[in-house]
Amino acid sequence: MTKKIKCALIGPGNIGTDLLAKLQRSAVLEPVWMVGIDPESDGLKRAREMGIKTTADGVDGLIPHMQADGVQIVFDATSAYVHAENSRKVNAQGALMIDLTPAAIGPFCVPPVNLIEHVGKGEMNVNMVTCGGQATIPMVAAVSRVQPVAYGEIIATVSSKSAGPGTRKNIDEFTRTTASAVEKVGGAKKGKAIIILNPAEPPLIMRDTVHCLLESEPDQAKITESIHAMIQEVQKYVPGYKLVNGPVFDGKRVSVFLEVEGLGDYLPKYAGNLDIMTAAAARTAEMFAEEILAGRLTLKPVHA
């Protein structure tokens, strides 16, 4: 039996429940706590049935147990409004916080683009941007590593059913955080993000459009090669990530059209937006866990 790093999840909604399913398959992570605020929530009930410890008292219900239960990594899948306080309390216990809200108080992490550089820095809070960011920023980065991108615009379309109350409350934060990460991680000089919730029935698969305006004429062969290479990187942890059309070149503009099919861990396969977020968070946590297990990373309490 290999040693696993123990984890807690805050937020038993769509994202938290999907993430729990992924963590249970991990070779290096073991989910032991699920934290919510509503004792009747489906997510808490489901976690209890799986034998996971639960609390409906929010993060304050978890803190007293973290040391005894050896929790070293905590995932926050609640809302941007409460994340800073959650993170402060968790960091004070010496645990790493992986933020799946658009709060973005820690540095952005998009695994195929910049995960490696984060792991060596010993950060105590990393932010997973947004589902739209995880799906599209690798494409912006694939273009910007070939030649400068003056402007990057991403449009993420997700099914209404896959957007729970937390996601809906965070729409403004979603657009701000994603646009910021299109610049900081994607490498665009200016970024813009748009999210569309589509109420169609049956629910539509996640679709993403990425437009990059270049400073000079595009090197079509190099950009095409870079995009295909990046798609293979993303597919390592989200197999349902695929290029539907593109790259399409129109003057200095490059456009890429994507679809993201989920694994169907919690919501059906149309909810690729959950998968790309939770798979990226699990991938990030696994990298940190491997460093901890190898003795290369020691987490220390952070007192605000």
From Swiss-Prot:
Pfam assignment, any one: AcetDehyd-dimer
Keyword tags: Aromatic hydrocarbons catabolism, NAD, Oxidoreductase, Plasmid
Taxonomy, superkingdom: Bacteria
Family: Belongs to the acetaldehyde dehydrogenase family.
Top-tier EC class: oxidoreductase
Keyword Oxidoreductase on entry: yes
Provenance organism: Polaromonas naphthalenivorans (strain CJ2)
Descriptive protein name: Acetaldehyde dehydrogenase
